[in-house]
Amino acid sequence: MLQTMKTLTLIPARLGSTRLPNKPLADICGKPMIVHVADRAAAAKLGRTVIATDSEEIFKVVAAHGHEAIMTRGDHESGSDRIYEALAKLDPSGEVDAVVNVQGDLPTIDPDTIRRALLPLEDGPADIATLGVEITVEEEKTNPNVVKIVGSPLAGNRRLRALYFTRATAPYGEGPLYHHIGLYAYRRSALERFVKLGPSPLEKREKLEQLRALEAGMRIDVEIVKTVPLGVDTQADLDRARTFCSQAGTI
């Protein structure tokens, strides 16, 4: 159950984005984007919230805004590797049961959406939990940047057991298609196993890290939510986040 599962929320952050340089420090309504994400993650109240970064600049900015950060190596190939290093440093005694990995480019994410990512771990047998939303925009069904979930419905269609993730349009036939949201909750043992696995053939083909877990026989359950949080990858995305902030008065 949630109240007995000791959880750590980690936000990986680096400055190496090529499409949007210095992305975590981009200003949104007078506050760096990574701080907006940390505020949202902390509001979810899933245990301790820590930013894992290889940047001293990010570390200092986060600390100046009252959040905890930890320095990690600069040679990690993925956010999963970075959060595993952070977990080992923050909890060497192994007391943490689950780790929630919140992407550092989701400045408008609802804290309740973050909380929902943990549900498949607290009441089911999944190794890894993540989020999805039904696709309602026709163009997104064929957009390779919108990752689709192929899964078996569980719990009255509010959850899926993931069978595959793909950039193609799938599954074929009548019925809803689901957009994958890249926010994960891992059982500690699952994260430890995942990072020790090498990149898998389908992972490399689709360029989707989560396929490594499925190819290794790990179970991923997907909690269905109502909206896709705004991910900031480009200047246009950043402009949308700033517009949202100015219209809402806050994020």
Swiss-Prot record:
Keywords per UniProt: Cytoplasm, Lipopolysaccharide biosynthesis, Nucleotidyltransferase, Transferase
Enzyme class name: transferase
Molecular function, one GO term: 3-deoxy-manno-octulosonate cytidylyltransferase activity
Pfam families: CTP_transf_3 (PF02348)
Pathway: Nucleotide-sugar biosynthesis; CMP-3-deoxy-D-manno-octulosonate biosynthesis; CMP-3-deoxy-D-manno-octulosonate from 3-deoxy-D-manno-octulosonate and CTP: step 1/1; Bacterial outer membrane biogenesis; lipopolysaccharide biosynthesis
The keyword Transferase is annotated on this UniProt entry: yes
Reactions catalysed according to its record: 3-deoxy-alpha-D-manno-oct-2-ulosonate + CTP = CMP-3-deoxy-beta-D-manno-octulosonate + diphosphate
Subcellular location: Cytoplasm
Domain of life: Bacteria
GO biological process terms, semicolon-separated: CMP-keto-3-deoxy-D-manno-octulosonic acid biosynthetic process; lipopolysaccharide biosynthetic process
Alphabetical list of CDD domains matching this protein: CMP-KDO-Synthetase
Entry annotated with the keyword Nucleotidyltransferase: yes
EC number assigned by the record: 2.7.7.38
Any GO CC annotation of this UniProt entry: cytosol
Protein family membership: Belongs to the KdsB family.
Role this protein plays: Activates KDO (a required 8-carbon sugar) for incorporation into bacterial lipopolysaccharide in Gram-negative bacteria.
Protein name (Swiss-Prot/TrEMBL): 3-deoxy-manno-octulosonate cytidylyltransferase
Species the sequence originates in: Brucella ovis (strain ATCC 25840 / 63/290 / NCTC 10512)
